Amino acid sequence: MSSGKIAQVVGPVVDVVFASGDKLPEINNALIVYKDGDKKQKIVLEVALELGDGMVRTIAMESTDGLTRGLEVLDTGRAISVPVGKETLGRVFNVLGETIDLEAPFADDVNREPIHKKAPAFDELSTSSEILETGIKVIDLLAPYLKGGKVGLFGGAGVGKTVLIQELIHNIAQEHGGISVFTGVGERTREGNDLYWEMKESGVIEKTAMVFGQMNEPPGARMRVALTGLTIAEYFRDVEGQDVLLFIDNIFRFTQAGSEVSALLGRMPSAVGYQPTLATEMGQLQERITSTKKGSVTSIQAIYVPADDYTDPAPATAFAHLDSTTNLERKLTQMGIYPAVDPLASSSRALSPEIVGEEHYAVATEVQRVLQRYRELQDIIAILGMDELSEEEKTLVGRARRIQFFLSQNFNVAEQFTGLPGSYVPVAETVRGFKEILEGKHDHLPEDAFRAVGPIEDVIEKAKKMGF
């Protein structure tokens, strides 16, 4: 184990010099430094660059407070390795695989895997066309998720990405019954804490591994924690042959952390100040999130859109890797429609008659056509009013508004805030409900009866209570 000394500390970036003749650590190797020589105060560094003359530049996985020039640094000879396998289920840990749930740490002999790996080869990949039912009407109807696919939840600040991801965990993890891995990347610690206790109460935690590198942690931890979660998911897929659900909240913070350290590593900033290696870093992460012939990884990723600008390089780079996109729209939150999923901007390659069936496809495309026509008519309505529309257009507008409200739904995870019980709607019920609205069977019911309900029977029941 070769050793060097700290030459310079600039925030999360630490330069380490090794004596001439000593073997230099490889890129991505983990180095260990003890604060003040205290074996309990260990800081892990990861080699990012080799500068020449025995000098390497590293990124710290923990705060560099207390580090001084001249402290001894040891090369472990391998990349950061984290615990994998059944021992990780029901546990919460950090980027280094250290437990943070106040329970006993992992045993020394626990199976460990390095967080840096190559993506599976082409001939190992599997192509599945099986739909993953979420129980959320707007998603199942218009932008269905594929089992073993990659899903992005796009939205600006405060439009409901985390609530939607928590509802998906509630619905899919309980229905799916398989193994889930939740990775919190640079998000609020409070949300992670709430999610942990919620999962503990529902019993889902027994089949879930949780990894966190939250907002208050150094960029090194936020940059690598997604790889830690992915490594655990890969083990369950490749070694145990399981179908795994991988939740990542939030992929943008992974990019943001890379951007924070990029300039300190001496790289020239690229578009909008992002790192020049943005596409490469995103590709290395996303290409590993895939399904092989041994098992599948279905990933659901929340992606923050800065200032609601979808042309920003961070969300734009993520777009290219996804099978389905669920776009959350601020205007819908202002109308009180939750989940605020934009039915026209959201898309999925699974929405084809070969995968979802002829009836589902026909209903979904007709719903989109009606909503698109309504959007076109809104300018006329705003300027001239409803009276200037033809009878046919008035009928279409009425149905479009009912469809728009019927796309909203109460969530189980939001019950404590709304006081209304959540609902899980099977795909067949969803398709039937929208088909009946399109056929005009419920034109006589008030629009408000369609707001925040489950299946179409709930609408009829709600309308009766309103006196219709």
From Swiss-Prot:
A Pfam family annotated for this UniProt entry: ATP-synt_VA_C
Annotated EC: 7.1.2.2
Coiled coil: none
CDD domains referenced in this protein's UniProt entry, alphabetically: ATP-synt_F1_beta_C, ATP-synt_F1_beta_N, F1-ATPase_beta_CD
Gene Ontology CC annotations of this record: plasma membrane; proton-transporting ATP synthase complex
A molecular function (GO) term: proton-transporting ATP synthase activity, rotational mechanism
Membrane topology of this protein: Peripheral membrane protein
This protein's record includes keyword S-adenosyl-L-methionine: no
Catalytic EC class: translocase
Keywords, ordered alphabetically: ATP synthesis, ATP-binding, Cell membrane, CF(1), Hydrogen ion transport, Ion transport, Membrane, Nucleotide-binding, Translocase, Transport
Family annotation (SMART domains): AAA
SUPFAM superfamilies, alphabetized: C-terminal domain of alpha and beta subunits of F1 ATP synthase, N-terminal domain of alpha and beta subunits of F1 ATP synthase, P-loop containing nucleoside triphosphate hydrolases
Subcellular locations according to the entry: Cell membrane
Reaction catalysed by this enzyme: ATP + H2O + 4 H(+)(in) = ADP + phosphate + 5 H(+)(out)
Binding site for ATP: G155, G156, A157, G158, V159, G160, K161, T162
Subunit details: F-type ATPases have 2 components, CF(1) - the catalytic core - and CF(0) - the membrane proton channel. CF(1) has five subunits: alpha(3), beta(3), gamma(1), delta(1), epsilon(1). CF(0) has three main subunits: a(1), b(2) and c(9-12). The alpha and beta chains form an alternating ring which encloses part of the gamma chain. CF(1) is attached to CF(0) by a central stalk formed by the gamma and epsilon chains, while a peripheral stalk is formed by the delta and b chains.
Family: Belongs to the ATPase alpha/beta chains family.
Purpose of the protein: Produces ATP from ADP in the presence of a proton gradient across the membrane. The catalytic sites are hosted primarily by the beta subunits.
Protein's name in the database: ATP synthase subunit beta
Organism, as annotated: Streptococcus equi subsp. zooepidemicus (strain MGCS10565)
Organism taxonomic ancestry: Bacteria, Bacillati, Bacillota, Bacilli, Lactobacillales
